[in-house]
Amino acid sequence: MRAFETEKTDVAEVDRSIYDIKDKPNAAFEVDSGLDKAIVEQISTEKHDPDWMRDFRLKSLDIYNSMPVQNWGPSIEGLDMRNIVTYVRPNTEMRGKWSEVPDDIKNTFERLGIPKAERASLAGVGAQYDSEVVYHNVKAEVAAQGVVYTDIESALNGPYAEMIRTHFMKLVPPTDHKFAALHGAVWSGGSFVYVPAGVHVEIPLQSYFRLNAPGAGQFEHTLIIVDKGAYLHFIEGCSAPKYNVANLHAGCVEIYVGENARVRYSTIENWSKNMYNLNTKRAKVEKGGTIEWVSGSFGSHTSCLYPMSILAGEGARMEFTGITFAGAGQDLDTGAKVVHAAPNTSSHITTKSIARDGGISNFRSAVTVLPNAAGSKSAVSCESLMLDDQSRSDTIPEMDIRCDAVDVGHEAKIGRISEEAVFYLMSRGLSEEDARALIVGGFAEPIAKELPVEYAVEMNNLIHLEMKGSIG
């Protein structure tokens, strides 16, 4: 993510153009638009898949063709798979040095601040451009601890092939929903992380996903395995320039958290307003382990995103902290799911949503407590801030409690910006637009404080971008 050096940023100073960079089309190869067996086989050939993966793709395609589109949530009628290009290979192979990445691609990531962030505060970086990872590197001292951080194709065709086969799409099977099946058929790119038992990766790893091609889809797969007693913070960033045609993001994240291990997965999504973001994220947590999700959703035309945690071992814990900002023409349907599948597990879901200019920001939660999960606790809290009379925010909680000896609660709040607070800040010298942006930033502060400082600043600047033009 781009690291801004000043603590205070006026609304007028935030530059949207860094995200709207459009590189000239220069793909080395791309498949035809649409989706059929020939296209899936072509992708598999381009990827040099082992036989089992080729078969997996074709079975996923059959599942995709047999499943209906979900009949709940935002409308995706504007997404026509006949017009989506599912694989675009950039004009470079993966590199281990930024100096070796072609200038047009490198310049895009430079403007987004990825190399700078790597030098300042990251243990390793992966950068994907369209359908392929173009850069991947991990610091030597981290690799020396036995940590594996590489693109997933290298792991699939290398020494970690069996580990990939054992875990790939086991948490999110193609039968999960239609777009999971689509992902299974056409996935490309993404990262593989393995942290050995007892190893603490003290500074974060990051993957950044950039979709440049108009009318294309991005289907990266991130697989993270953190062994017993280990720790990892993984950061995911994404962006794309805006086009007049639909783009699709249907990635997948699978996280395996070992006994007494801890994983934090932070995401700042800034997709363009023509993007359909239909991403699936899931974690399985063993005894005494912890999964922490931190999520910021600021872009896309339509989003369906509900990270799910399966608390499989006694004392496993999940925390989800998220913020969503929906503006004009956006329908963002987000939230979190948790399954308490063992005794004395706990979950805490905290979300904040902001809507303006007719935007729709919905929150969904699903808490399931299985019969063997006695002593478990779950708390769900969501707050919504409406900036006008045209916007909409709904809370849709689900609770499936199959055990008596549990403590489960849900609370929801909705409010508006206080005009008295705006007047006070204006009396202290702020413009009305900056005053409103400051109040919204304060509303989002509990989420920002969960991020490393560079990313908290980035999130606040994205809020400022969304607030531009909020007056009048």
Predicted regions and their residues:
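Short, low-to-moderate order helix/coil transition modules at the start of elongated helical scaffolds
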Residues: 2-252, 256-262
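Conserved beta-strand/loop scaffold segments within soluble protein domains that form the structured core
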Residues: 135-137, 141, 145-430, 444-472
